[in-house]
Amino acid sequence: LSSWKPLTAPVAGFVALMGVGTLVPALAGVMGLALPFFGLILLGYVLGKLLDIEEAGLGWMNAFIIYLALPALYFNLISVTPISELANWRFILVTSLCTLTAFAAGIAIGWFAAGGRLDEATIQGVGAGYSNVGYMGPGLTLATLGTASVAPTALIFAFDSAIFFTLVPFLMGIANGAKESFARTGLLAMKRVLTHPFNVSIMLAALAAWAQWTPPETIHKILVWLQNAAAPCALFVMGVTVALRPVRGVAKETPLLLLVKLVLHPLLVWVAMTWVGGFNPVWVYTAVLMAALPPALNTFVMARQYDVYVERASNLIMAGTVASVFTVTGLLYVLTTSAGR
């Protein structure tokens, strides 16, 4: 029975939100959008706490998600998107600058919290600026804003990944005395960005959109099946991953980092895109929603890769995911009301 104790609060919170959606008709629509996503995360969390299965068991499911399911989702939706939408450099510039600003704010917080340790500050910056654009982003934006959100979702994923997979190795190289040359570090980072399965699928989809090519019926059906599995599998794995991380208290800087990630980052995106102007409203809503997502699981992956801030990165992701149930749900209400859905 002791294994049920960690489940009491998240399950009770989820049931309470369902009750709110039932009792307040105005919120029923947004709860219907948000709760299935967080419900799948909760299911993964529950099984992760109850079943005695080693974390290594997630390996093949992660491979399925990263190499097949999410790439299929990106390919299917982007390949039918007009190529002109995929070359929206104003959008790329604005959203990337906002991400860099949130990253820099997180590094500044981490610098003071860690007593000037650049390696720890860098991981904290990742937690403050890198949204969960891979596992949560595509399914949530598609369900909320429709197929018009696919192109901006893909662009944000591709360029946010490029930012963090490039800057983090450089900053860690500086923090660790630059044991490898910056040129070699840059080449390795670029290789990692260009060969990431998500980015490969985005590039192939853009090529297909440019050539107006459609896959044969058999291939198309396989891609559709994979696409349909993407969101449920990704969210379930996210829940299990969070459940398997040890929680031993919240670091003093965590609330500030989450304030940047969940509140200031989306607010900055909204202000910047409104100020620049000329964007399709769906693209604005997509960018704001992507910025409001909790810290990416890659925060923990990078922390473990460099063996720094590992446990606190795990706690940051868990706290951010729990807090985002309320912040993202509130944002969804605002967006769906603004979009007239």
Model-predicted regions and their roles:
Residues L1-R341:
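Alpha-helical transmembrane segments of multi-pass small-molecule/ion transporters
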